[in-house]
Amino acid sequence: MRPKPGTGPWWDQRYRDGRDGWELGEPAPPLRHFLATDPRAPQPPGRILVPGCGRGHEVALLAQCGFAVVGLDISAEALREARRCHGNGSDRLQWVLADVLDPEACLAAGLAPASCSGVVEHTCFCAIHPSLRQAYLKAVCELLQPGGWLLGLFWCHDQPDGPPYGCDPDRLAADLVAAGLEPEIWQPAEHSACGRDGRQRCDEWLGLWRRQP
């Protein structure tokens, strides 16, 4: 029987089959450039969560920057690949198999409410079904400390189906505000690698959002 779409076993099969057109083999260029050059970029120390981390390229980058980073994914196969690429973990890098939408699983993994100073979003939001997006943003906001930040790179496209599912930047901004986040940066991303996975009409938006006290 085929795994249910969006579940851990379903993503496991995609990794095993090589159906990973989102994969760049490196951290997303807009995030890497922003963290390296923008004076508004968050600075260590801090505990950072990367939900839907996949092979963990952003996790490794953030650990190199000096953050303590938790790479979380529902796919055991993705985390196996992450360990192969970046090691089993260290005092600044931890891999966790859990669903960010499951608060009990997060708590069991040491991710209590308000336990993170930051969250870095890259390909998790576009991977989950749009019907779960408000729940996802609420879960992320609850994991942030008051005043904590969300740094996100979001795929915005109008093509049907997914994943990756598209979004409208204005609607997404409204949803982020509704979840309890205030914008500090919300703009088209520079150095975008969009167009992967055969999608030619796609814009990436970069945002830095702050949880309201």
What are these regions (language model features)?
Residues 123, 127:
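Short catalytic micro-motifs in class I SAM-dependent methyltransferases
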Residues 115-116:
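Local beta-strand N-terminus motif with an aromatic residue
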Residues 120:
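A conserved beta-strand element that flanks and buttresses the S-adenosyl-L-methionine
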Residues 1-49, 54-112, 128-143, 148-213:
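Class I (Rossmann-like) S-adenosyl-L-methionine-dependent methyltransferase catalytic domain
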